[in-house]
Regions:
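ABC ATPase C-loop
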Residues: 180, 186-187
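Conserved ABC ATPase "signature" region
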Residues: 76, 143-163, 272
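The feature captures the beta-strand-to-loop junction immediately N-terminal to the Walker
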Residues: 41-44
Length: 370
């Protein structure tokens, strides 16, 4: 087995608030290998964006990474150890924030953010922002950096980049602004790009163009991607493997085809049943009952059990970590005790009501709302 390009183990990021501690990312692990696209999927509030920000060390106060290990090409970027008084602290082998900023962020690991208007400075031209980024990260003189910037804009299919170089962000359409962010991400030819829902604000036609562009660039440069999204159609189109998150934890991890064809976790199944699928014909879609709980006070046991149609009493007691439950040689991890791999006597445990069952008599869903 080859060493992963990126390895994240037991990552924990939390936010201290007046109401208590929000465990936004609570012990997730995943790998990314050379040249592959890995999906990070889940509803809003699952912790996807916080996970990406943690890898990039962009978590803002009052947020803090409090545990886990992140390795890149086998080198430890971040790890923790126990201090003399029992406190958890960064280990000496972790890169300092300055080292990470100078060596890793932008050069080896880049990002594409969701909203270009928040990521681009409105008072500076597109070209000046891209040129400055290249000057800093590739250590090029201004003229050479400008030439590289123009060529990079050309690579992401911005027409006449020499003429658009001195235009401001508001003079570009949403799709074109997203292309500028992609240009900024690939300008230093990084090995890994973390894309945080980069097509969410775009219409379907422009989204398709952006996905095709990313696919072409990946083929040209061999870049790996972590693609954060709630859109399962995008996942099916571009991802090699998928990680499904729920309330700060991993619910399921599998090859993309295996995930869609042989789903192992009730949450993933619920996600798939709530969206149209071209490979299946259904009379109506089934929404996921209830809402995701707050991470400040998660349910006991499995965090999905209050909404799960398969929940039993044991699900209130056991919070399972993802485990291989595959029926084949292909690894397929799921955090659900209904599988024999967990050996908790699920079959003989008493079924419990999900939120949908409990409030079903009062819940009316019209055909137009499905």
């Amino acid at each position: 087995m080859t060493t992963p390009l990126l390895s994240v183990e037991n990552l924990q990021t939390q936010f201290e608030t007046a109401e208590g501690t929000v465990r936004a990312v609570d012990g997730i692990s995943f790998d990314v290998h050379e040249g592959e696209t890995v999906g990070l999927v889940g509803e809003s509030g699952a912790g996807k964006s916080v996970a990406i920000s943690s890898v990039l060390r962009l978590v803002e106060s009052p947020g803090e990474i409090v545990g886990g290990e992140i390795r890149f090409r086998g080198e430890t970027l971040l790890s923790f150890e126990e201090g003399p008084n029992g406190e958890r602290r960064q280990s000496p082998e972790s890169l300092s924030n300055k080292e990470f900023r100078q060596r890793i962020r932008g050069r080896e690991i880049a990002t594409i953010f969701q909203d270009p208007m928040e990521s681009l400075n409105p008072v500076f031209t597109i070209g000046s922002q891209l040129q400055e980024f290249i000057e800093i990260n590739r250590e090029l003189p201004p003229k050479d950096a400008r030439d590289v910037a123009i060529e990079t804009l050309r690579e992401v299919d911005i027409p006449k980049p020499e003429d658009r170089f001195d235009d401001y962000p508001h003079e570009f359409s949403g799709g074109m602004r997203q292309r500028v962010l992609i240009a900024m991400a690939i300008a230093c030819q990084p090995s890994l790009i973390l894309a945080d829902e980069p097509t969410t604000a775009l219409d379907v036609t422009v989204e398709g163009q952006i996905l095709n562009l990313v696919s072409d660039l990946q083929e040209e440069y061999g870049t790996s991607f972590v693609w954060v999204t709630h859109d399962l159609a995008v996942v099916a189109d571009i991802c090699d493997r998928v990680n499904v998150m729920y309330l700060g934890q991993m619910a399921e991890q599998a090859d993309v085809h295996d995930l869609f064809d042989n789903t192992k976790h009730p949450y993933t199944e619920a996600l798939l049943q709530s969206v149209p699928r071209p490979d299946k014909t259904v009379e109506s879609l089934t929404p996921i009952e209830g809402v995701m709980p707050e991470a400040i006070n998660p349910p006991s046991g499995c965090r999905f059990h209050p909404r799960c149609p398969d929940a039993r009493a044991v699900c209130r007691e056991v919070n399972p970590e993802p485990r291989n439950v595959s029926d084949t040689d292909t690894r397929h991890n799921a955090a659900c005790v209904k599988h024999d791999a967990f050996d908790v006597d699920y079959e003989h445990s008493t079924p419990i009501q999900s939120e949908g069952d409990e409030f079903g008599e009062d819940l009316q869903v019209t055909e137009g709302s499905r």
